[in-house]
Amino acid sequence: MRCPFCQDAENKVIDSRESHEGSVIRRRRECLTCKRRFTTYERVEELYPLIVKKDGRREAFDREKIVNGLKKACEKRPVSADQLEETVVAIERQLQGMGEKEVPSSVIGEEIMRRLRQLDEVAYVRFASVYRSFRDIAEFMDELKALREAEAREQRQAPPSAPVDKGG
């Protein structure tokens, strides 16, 4: 590893730590020539399947497409950057866990929608309106109705919450 300051290859590791749930090793290094310190990150090479588009084209997985889609959907919503990153990482892990060489883009789109629905309903509807190419307000309203019906089903299936003791 070359020093980013003097380009010398001689350096020593002064500290190593795991980060990002153990998937990355952060190393603090000191150049033996110029004595300046710098940080490097080591991670396992991630292999993703090819993405098969609706028209049959195949392209390499592009994390930034997911990030950008989520950012647009969540713009001006109470969703933190950490929540977006966790969502992207979860989708990446799911793709890697499939063990497939090719995955239809629809699988990724549906997974994004599933996760957005749990994260923020407005962001979910925004994403769905683009992803599903709503043609008019009726399709938009149908999606909202389906969202409300799913919520009602989930509430009926949820175990009742324990009564709150009001200290009386």
Swiss-Prot record:
This is Transcriptional repressor NrdR. It comes from the Bacteria. Its cofactor is Zn(2+). Keywords: ATP-binding, DNA-binding, Metal-binding, Nucleotide-binding, Repressor, Transcription, Transcription regulation, Zinc, Zinc-finger. InterPro entries: ATP-cone_dom, NrdR-like_N, RNR_NrdR-like. Binds 1 zinc ion. Pfam families: ATP-cone, Zn_ribbon_NrdR. PROSITE patterns: ATP_CONE. One of its GO terms (biological process) is negative regulation of DNA-templated transcription. A zinc finger (unnamed) spans 3-34. GO terms for molecular function: ATP binding; DNA binding; zinc ion binding. Negatively regulates transcription of bacterial ribonucleotide reductase nrd genes and operons by binding to NrdR-boxes. Belongs to the NrdR family. Residues 49-139 form the ATP-cone domain. The keyword Lyase does not apply. The keyword NADP does not apply.
